[in-house]
Structures are given as structure tokens and as C-alpha cells.
């Protein structure tokens, strides 16, 4: 399993709309992508920053999403996000939620 995380700065008072857009616009787009498994989104306590973690079957699936749908997702969020997102990737080594063990990624 592979994950991509995106860190964004939120516009003032935009957290509720950000959450709505993730639920109603972004997650349906992600579900259409090959290899998509899950999305978990966090918002900082002061409501100024959000982190989205998308989970993919393979690194290739995440890379394909980046080439095809990532720009559309960010366009959808343009009304609530400021600045350039920080993007990173990682192999998932453990997850109680997804029931995987480190041996599966070794």
C-alpha cells in the first residue's frame, strides 16, 4: 500500500467549506481512480491548515492519479486554499485500520 499526503493552508473561516468539498466533490473523484483505497483528512486545531492522506494499492496508481486527476482536485479546492500545497509520498508500513503488517511491504 502507498500513501500520498497533501498539506494545504486554508483561507480564513474556510474549514467547514473545505470539509464539505472533500466529502461531496473530492472523495467521489478519488473513488473513480484506479487503485484508490481511502482518504483521511485532518484539520489543525486553529483551522488554518489541512492534511489529506490518500491511500493507493500501488505507487503506480498514485502516480497515475497525479498525472490525471490531481489538478482537478486542487482546482475544486481553489476557493478555500491559499498558496502552493506541499506534497509527499510514502510506503505504508503498518495500519490497524487497513489491517496490514510491515512484512507485506518488506
PLM feature spans:
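Short S/T/G/P-rich N-terminal loop/turn motif that feeds into the first structured element of a domain
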Residues: 1-51, 55-71, 79-106
Amino acid at each position: 500500500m502507498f500513501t500520498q499526503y497533501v498539506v494545504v493552508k486554508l483561507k480564513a473561516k474556510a474549514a467547514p467549506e473545505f470539509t464539505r468539498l472533500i466529502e461531496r466533490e473530492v472523495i467521489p473523484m478519488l473513488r473513480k481512480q484506479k487503485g484508490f483505497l481511502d482518504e483521511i483528512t485532518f484539520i489543525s486545531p486553529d483551522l488554518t491548515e489541512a492534511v489529506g492522506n490518500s491511500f493507493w494499492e500501488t505507487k503506480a496508481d498514485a502516480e497515475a492519479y497525479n498525472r490525471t486527476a490531481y489538478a482537478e482536485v486542487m482546482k475544486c479546492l481553489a476557493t478555500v486554499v491559499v498558496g502552493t500545497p506541499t506534497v509527499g509520498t510514502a510506503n505504508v508500513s503498518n495500519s490497524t485500520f487497513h489491517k496490514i503488517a510491515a512484512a507485506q511491504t518488506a
